[in-house]
């Protein structure tokens, strides 16, 4: 698999079986790279990024020893996407008002006026 790059792409999460080397993805059989919110739809605090990275690490550790496949990457990506939605609904994450597109892909913002 050293020459094969597996990837999973969801709306806000991209996973690659690769490492970043001089801004390039280099396929790697024993490393996963997480690209979080590539379209900058959300405003991320360091604490929230850390929570998502910790969840990512938990998912990777839970799958350790298993087959690394498109399916296993999709499961991790889908779980992270759901976790991001939970953070948004809990008010820990917010939409970026300066984002390229305002499509509210995970539902309308939760503000006191709308609750």
UniProtKB/Swiss-Prot annotation:
Keywords: Membrane, NAD, NADP, Plastoquinone, Quinone, Thylakoid, Translocase, Transport. Its EC number is 7.1.1.-. It comes from the Bacteria. GO terms for cellular component: plasma membrane-derived thylakoid membrane. It catalyses: a plastoquinone + NADH + (n+1) H(+)(in) = a plastoquinol + NAD(+) + n H(+)(out); a plastoquinone + NADPH + (n+1) H(+)(in) = a plastoquinol + NADP(+) + n H(+)(out). The keyword Translocase applies. It is a peripheral membrane protein. NDH-1 shuttles electrons from an unknown electron donor, via FMN and iron-sulfur (Fe-S) centers, to quinones in the respiratory and/or the photosynthetic chain. The immediate electron acceptor for the enzyme in this species is believed to be plastoquinone. Couples the redox reaction to proton translocation, and thus conserves the redox energy in a proton gradient. Cyanobacterial NDH-1 also plays a role in inorganic carbon-concentration. Belongs to the complex I NdhM subunit family. NDH-1 can be composed of about 15 different subunits; different subcomplexes with different compositions have been identified which probably have different functions. This is NAD(P)H-quinone oxidoreductase subunit M. It comes from Parasynechococcus marenigrum (strain WH8102).
């Amino acid at each position: 698999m050293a020459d094969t790059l597996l990837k999973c792409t969801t709306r806000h999460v991209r996973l690659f079986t690769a490492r970043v080397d001089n801004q390039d993805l280099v396929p790697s059989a024993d490393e996963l790279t997480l690209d979080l919110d590539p379209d900058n739809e959300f405003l991320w605090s360091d604490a929230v990024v850390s929570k998502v990275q910790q969840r990512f690490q938990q998912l990777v550790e839970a799958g350790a020893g298993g087959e690394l496949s498109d399916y296993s990457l999709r499961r991790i990506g889908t779980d992270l996407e759901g976790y991001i939605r939970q953070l948004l609904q809990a008010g820990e994450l917010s939409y970026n008002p300066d984002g390229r597109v305002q499509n509210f892909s995970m539902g309308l913002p939760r503000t006191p006026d709308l609750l």
